[in-house]
Amino acid sequence: MAESWLRLCGAGPGEEAGPEGGMEEPDALDDSLTSLQWLQEFSILNAKAPTLPPGGTDPLGYHQVPGLVAPGSPLAADPACLGQPHTPGKPTSSCTSRSAPPGLQAPPPDDVDYATNPHVKPPYSYATLICMAMQASKATKITLSAIYKWITDNFCYFRHADPTWQNSIRHNLSLNKCFIKVPREKDEPGKGGFWRIDPQYAERLLSGAFKKRRLPPVHIHPAFARQAAQEPSTAPWGGPLTVNREAQQLLQEFEEATGEGGWGTGEGRLGHKRKQPLPKRVAKVLRPPSTLLLTQEEQGELEPLKGNFDWEAIFEAGALGEELSSLEGLELSPPLSPSSHGEVDLTVHGRHINCPATWGPPVEQATDSLDFDETFLATSFLQHPWDESSSGCLPPEPLFEAGDATLAADLQDWASVGAFL
């Protein structure tokens, strides 16, 4: 055994030595760790090599070496297996049969007896099972326990299955709109309520249309359907707008309340523009301006006002023209330039009028004010803004006296001007 192991490991004849040579023979060698015989039982040996077509070539030289299946196989790199005949091996994991996952089971055949077969689940929804139990009871209402009993009597699968399916039955009865709960009367014996099918969903349940929950159909109120039929759909870019009877009645009541006309004229331009397809907008509309409430005759009278006004005719007519005509002889000199130092020249009918003293401020005062502003800006931060002890305030009496004197002088000058008018 030791000699064969050393020969496989590549030991030369000079290196082989017996117990006399000083080398000890191992007590027990595990052949399973060094033997390569398990490769002969590998499943790749069972695979057939691809056959070449007649007249074909072998560019890679697969068939030149006897015993080789493919260059990538585990046996191709093992020189100990070269030239050995291929023997059929045992099936391994690649040849094991695979079972289908539990969720992808084949559909049950049509000839399955669900009353006796406990392994096949019936292909019906819980809502359909409830409906079938109610139809088989021949009564207008049925209890929950009666539904359980009918399902277990007719389907053997539910007799052996986990009892959690009863929770699904209760949930369908409570959440599905196809079933209606009927309370038990006082004189009826027993506990709990009854259940029955809504008549409008009975046919659909029996035909299998309610295997999955669906939303109930949408019902349109007859009043809205009639209103939609009366109001024709008009494009926003073409065709005149139409008003239904309710909107016309609201318009009439609005005109009577305001006491003004012009909104009901359907032939005019304003009538077409003010008509709205929805009565809500008409009810909430604000009061229109006064120009929109005028009739066509009044609007025709206002048309000349849109042109140019004859100002000369307006000034010449009436008392206004007489008062303004007296001012034609009044001659006013052009305004003084900033550099001029002269007085204002007022001449009425060749007679000179002196200018009031308040009209011509001296130039020196302006220059003094500039100096005062600069001085005030420079010294403003040194003084407290609310200094009550400062004596720079002037008494109000001289100011009022000076103002009265100036006002009296102005009135006297204007009285002299009015005498010439």
From Swiss-Prot:
The keyword Transcription applies. It comes from the Eukaryota. Its main location: nucleus. SMART domains: FH. It is found in: Nucleus. The keyword Transcription applies. This is Forkhead box protein J1.
